[in-house]
Amino acid sequence: MVKIIYEIVPHDGGWAYRLGGVYSDRFNAYFGLLTETAIGVLKADIAFVSAPAADNDAAYHMDESVVRTKRAMLAASAHPCLMINGRRMGHTALYRLADLAEFRTIVSDRPLPPAIQARLEEAGTTVRIAYEEDD
């Protein structure tokens, strides 16, 4: 049986769950088999995941344990959402996280290259551009 630790943390509302596993100071998150197993018993409406690199086809990450945990999050979500810095488009990393078309929504800080945008639209992926509002 997997124990899910329920903890209230400072935020604007909702709940936060600390799933356990091996804590990484580098990524400020938990990873490993315990984390992946705990995610496997959950179902989320939406999962927001980030990636440090993406090319025309996929999102990538340089750490295997991060990829496994993020893949588990995507599998447990009804609406997988990728958040990516537009400057990271056109780059790859060692591990393939997911095909870009597997995400229902992609949020970037700048428009994606037209060829990628067209392919994602064909696949039914919504692309949103995040911006700061002027005060």
Predicted regions and their residues:
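Conserved phosphate- and dinucleotide-binding cores of soluble alpha/beta proteins
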Residues: 3-135
